[in-house]
Amino acid sequence: MRLDKYLAETAQCTRSEAKTLLQKGRVTVNGAVCKKGDTQLKDSDTVAVDGQPLAYQQFVYLMLNKPDGVVSASTDKRDTTVVDLIGDAYPRRELFPAGRLDKTSTGFVLLTDDGGFAHDILAPKRHVSKTYTVTLDTPLTEEMRQGFAEGVTLADGTALSPAEVSALSEDGLVVRVVLKQGVYHQIKRMFGVYGAGVNGLHRDAIGGLELDKTLAPGQWRELTAAEVAEITTK
């Protein structure tokens, strides 16, 4: 990879900004100042800016605690999007949400620029689970439990895969739902089959990775390599 491209991707700057860094002698390769942007780097090379080593990251993976009222999209002409919440932290990255939450739903949204990984966790054949806390307007019933376990057939005839549902509150109004597929407004439509309405929906986990409880609504952080791997373990 060319040095100027490496700088643009790791220092999160434009090519022109990278050129300025090089011209000012602020960039070193293996400890020696380098001012040539077309220098080809080897995997073993260490690049630093102002003495601070840079680490190349092919892809970015972010955990966001989505607040109510924000849409799960990269761009939107009317509403704030999940990508808007990241601001200018990754100007050279084309981030997008891997999966969606409704505008009024909250919780774990994964943002990345890794299309292959996003496809893997969303593909039904991969069976990557998503776990939700759902607030209902009518208590959970045994009929609902059994129906979810067998696979609900929606009003339009769509047959869904089996899902898990269990009560989290004594009155049965707060429940946990675990899905392994994604259909538009799926949870609301599933409960709608039984005449139950959804008053609140919060995504707690994707695969084996739970939402960081220290993240307030609207906050985000990068995932470690180990956390990215956890997503596909459940």
What are these regions (language model features)?
Residues 1-234:
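Basic, flexible Lys/Arg- and Gly-enriched helix-loop patches that mediate nucleic-acid binding at interfaces
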